[in-house]
């Protein structure tokens, strides 16, 4: 089990309360697909992903980005039980979708960039450290069924 300090919990939940899940989720997934184009193969059913403009304007990317970040909110609400919180999603991504677990780490890194861009004043080095820890823990929980 991961140990969270009171300060880490406050930094995570405080920033999360300001996050526009639809906007930041859409941006994070779009950035993942643009920066790491090989991840697009998992989203073939989303239609046109042929250019950054197409990806940014794709309503399915926006909707799924919101869904992904909404799910990430479950981690924020369950900091002391992230492994179990993501158990079913880990199984889905491993057994049915066959997603490379490295992609979870990549998305976490992208989320850090999105949060820093949206909340530059609040995203102090201490806040970044707490969020880096959180995205690592979430990525590990999502990759759990692969082991």
From Swiss-Prot:
Instruction: Give tissue specificity per the record.
Output: Red blood cells.
Globin domain: residues covered:
3-147
Q: Return the Pfam families for the record.
A: Globin
Annotated binding of heme b, by residue: 64, 93
User: GO CC annotation: what is one?
Assistant: extracellular space
What keywords are annotated for this sequence in UniProt?
Heme, Iron, Metal-binding, Oxygen transport, Transport
Q: Name one GO biological process term.
A: cellular oxidant detoxification
Is Heme among the key words of this record? yes
MF terms (GO), sorted A to Z: heme binding; hemoglobin binding; metal ion binding; oxygen binding; oxygen carrier activity
Asked if the keyword Heme belongs to this entry, the reply reads yes
Q: Name the domain of life this protein comes from.
A: Eukaryota
Against InterPro entries, the record matches this protein to:
Globin, Globin-like_sf, Globin/Proto, Hemoglobin_b, Hemoglobin_oxygen_transport
- Spell out the CDD domains in the cross-references: Hb-beta-like
User: Known Gene3D superfamilies for this protein?
Assistant: Globins
Which family does the UniProt entry place this protein in?
Answer: Belongs to the globin family.
What this chain does, per the record? Involved in oxygen transport from the lung to the various peripheral tissues. The beta chain is a component of adult hemoglobin A and D.
Q: Which PANTHER family match?
A: HEMOGLOBIN FAMILY MEMBER, HEMOGLOBIN SUBUNIT EPSILON
This protein's assembly is summarised as: Heterotetramer of 2 alpha (or alpha-D) and 2 beta chains.
Its protein name is Hemoglobin subunit beta
- The organism of origin for this protein: Gallus gallus (Chicken)
* Gene that this polypeptide is encoded by: HBB
